[in-house]
Amino acid sequence: MSAQELPLDVRRALASVARVPRLLVASDYDGTIAPIVSDPSKAFPQRESVSALRALAGLANTTAAVISGRALRDLAALSRLPVEVQLIGSHGSEFDVGFVHAIDSDAKQLLTEINSAFSKIAAENPGVTVEMK
């Protein structure tokens, strides 16, 4: 598809974005650059999405990022995105550069208890799964 085939309002919006001095392009992971699949550990990114993010990250004054509810280490291992693409995990509390907010032991314990309770509910309902994030 060429730019001329895009609706006029989309072309105007793109022209406006292209004039900003610094651009952040951020995308969700699951259901956006990777398909929703029945086994979350197999949600690999689509090649076209990786190529687009890599190209965007290579542009001057442009940062490309992927944000996910997944833990940062899981997002990095599963996505295998190039280092030029910034990764942000745990709904924004973990970054691959700059800083990371560690989850304290009380919060980890609470998360374990919540996961256990939800897993019991899921076990009683066919087709329901719980993914620890």
Please annotate each region the language model reported.
Residues 1-29, 33-37:
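Non-catalytic pre-domain segments flanking phosphatase-related domains
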Residues 21-22, 28-45, 100-109:
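Metal-dependent phosphoesterase signature
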